[in-house]
Amino acid sequence: MSQFDNVSVIKQANVYFGGKCISHTVQFPDGSRKTLGVILPSTLHFETGAPEVMEIVAGGCRVQLAGQTGWQSYQAGDSFSIPGNSGFQIEVSDTLHYVCHFG
């Protein structure tokens, strides 16, 4: 799916890590939400409250989930799941475009 229809977008950006990760929240009619964003080249650590699925739209990254020693590589078209109350490290060498699905 290349677009979301019939949604509301929060105008204020979510800016993390000094601007290395920037996203916008999209709200759906059923009350669910997603964020659409970019991560600039960096290695970052994110914490999760609710379970998340990260969908890679463009670019690539390496990810290490909390409690794991190995890294997994992901490219455009891939996705990975993060449990709630957990975290992950993400390493990006070129700008990464993503959709974060919550719940």
From Swiss-Prot:
Catalytic activity: a purine D-ribonucleoside + phosphate = a purine nucleobase + alpha-D-ribose 1-phosphate; adenosine + phosphate = alpha-D-ribose 1-phosphate + adenine; cytidine + phosphate = cytosine + alpha-D-ribose 1-phosphate; guanosine + phosphate = alpha-D-ribose 1-phosphate + guanine
A GO molecular function held by the record: purine-nucleoside phosphorylase activity
GO CC annotations, alphabetized: cytosol
Assigned EC number: 2.4.2.1, 2.4.2.2
UniProt superkingdom: Bacteria
Pfam families from the UniProt entry: Ppnp
InterPro entries: Ppnp (IPR009664), RmlC-like_jellyroll (IPR014710), RmlC_Cupin_sf (IPR011051)
Keywords of this entry: Glycosyltransferase, Transferase
PANTHER family, A to Z: PYRIMIDINE/PURINE NUCLEOSIDE PHOSPHORYLASE, PYRIMIDINE_PURINE NUCLEOSIDE PHOSPHORYLASE
Family, similarity comment: Belongs to the nucleoside phosphorylase PpnP family.
Function: Catalyzes the phosphorolysis of diverse nucleosides, yielding D-ribose 1-phosphate and the respective free bases. Can use uridine, adenosine, guanosine, cytidine, thymidine, inosine and xanthosine as substrates. Also catalyzes the reverse reactions.
Identification of the protein by name: Pyrimidine/purine nucleoside phosphorylase
Species annotation: Methylococcus capsulatus (strain ATCC 33009 / NCIMB 11132 / Bath)
Lineage start: Bacteria, Pseudomonadati, Pseudomonadota, Gammaproteobacteria, Methylococcales
Protein's gene: ppnP
